[in-house]
Amino acid sequence: LFDPDSNVPRGEFLAMCMHLTGTETLQGVLSTGFGDDMQIPAWSKAYVATALMNGDVCGCSDGTAIVFDAQRGITAAEAAVMLSSFLEPSPAAALESDYIPEWACAAVSSLTSCGVYPDGSDCAAPITRAEAAQMLLGAYELLQKR
């Protein structure tokens, strides 16, 4: 069931990005290296560990450890940064907005300029499956042009 209005967990969006770009995952991964490893679903550990090793994700602090937070809904800004790390789009002029976090500005600007990131998205809001599908379709179309 697609359920277009439900939020996309961070781990699922990462797996979608890696499938889209043909990124091979490590085999036999039992641990990701993140402080919340026990909460990361077994099916996604290879994706998370591979992306961490390749520098495509870095996690964030929960006050006690660096965590990936695989089950939490990914925000639009986080999705832009994650997808951008796999696509490596051409740099674009920074968008002027008080709503784009500084750490996501380059990714949001680049993906917006190439039509992957929907202009005017709420960067702080979790993305839905429909929004993720729209972003990934834009990314697929961008990859086909290369």
Segments and roles (model prediction):
Residues T50, N54-D56:
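BRCT (BRCA1 C-terminal) phosphopeptide-binding modules in DNA damage response/checkpoint, repair
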Residues L1-L14, M18-A46, V57-A77, L83-P126, ...:
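Feature responds to low-complexity, polar/acidic, surface-exposed segments characteristic
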